[in-house]
Amino acid sequence: MVRELRLVVTADDYDEALRFYRDVLGLPERAAFSSPGGRVTILEAGRATLEITDPPHAEYIDEVEVGRRVAGHIRVAFEVDDSTATTRELEEAGATVVAEPTKTPWNSLNARLEAPAGLQLTLFTELE
């Protein structure tokens, strides 16, 4: 039985990635370790799910959120309280906005960003 999903990201600029995800996005630090010449930090990211999609549906999601196909095989999605405000905060902290928040057919407000460590992010807020 799986107990935890852990996404491991190799960041060329470790300090910038840590600042962005821990200090700006607000992911709490669970643990940090070092090895000769290397470091790792484990950040809490709330409840985790694994969303598996086929290529046509991934293309559909990109069309809805961005207007064109932009995601690779992996995209990280964070549910946030206010996707519009969080998009602005992350942009000010160095992320590139790929698509501004847009209302989706599944009733959420989704934004797409390129973030440190080469991750493409979706920020989403479920609408009532």
Regions found by a protein language model. Name each.
Residues 17-22, 90, 118:
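Conserved active-site tyrosine of GNAT-family acetyltransferases
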Residues 120-123:
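Short glycine-/small-residue motifs
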Residues 1-6, 28-77, 87-114, 125-128:
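Vicinal oxygen chelate
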